[in-house]
Amino acid sequence: MSFTTLLVTALTASGLGLGGPVRAQDHQHAMTPSAPAAGDARQLVKFPEPMRLHTITSMRDHLRALQEITDSLSRNDFEKAASIAESRLGMSSLEAHGAAHIAPFMPQGMQDIGTQMHRTASRFAVEAQTASVGNDVRPALAALGVVMQQCVACHAAYRLR
């Protein structure tokens, strides 16, 4: 089974799926960052502007980390994938992201999802290290899907301002 097939299987199993290539011209939204689309039922979380900017920057780094992890997995560089996951997404990344300073501004549910994301990233790191020994990437991909589920859950429930 190819890496791509395994990735699609893991993403589909995690509920994320793949709808084909994403193109910017297919995603012209009728909303601005300050005016959410009608019917946006996500809970608005108001952060002081410096905290909002820090949180957005942190989430963008999380997304870059996921891309780097996926790239590392595609090259069978499981140790690098594990290292990226733990240092930038895992429980040991909390201090670097300033989690203790941001958490008081988050609703409890958002805090819980964030904590789960960091925990599942640490679990993924262990699965990626195990893959380097056994050369079976499937458990690592499944664990990565669980990490991404936390991101999807948080972005589906909350919006920042």
Question: What are the roles of these predicted feature ranges?
Answer:
Residues 20-24:
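Sec/Tat signal peptide C-region and signal peptidase I cleavage site
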Residues 5-17:
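Bacterial N-terminal signal peptides
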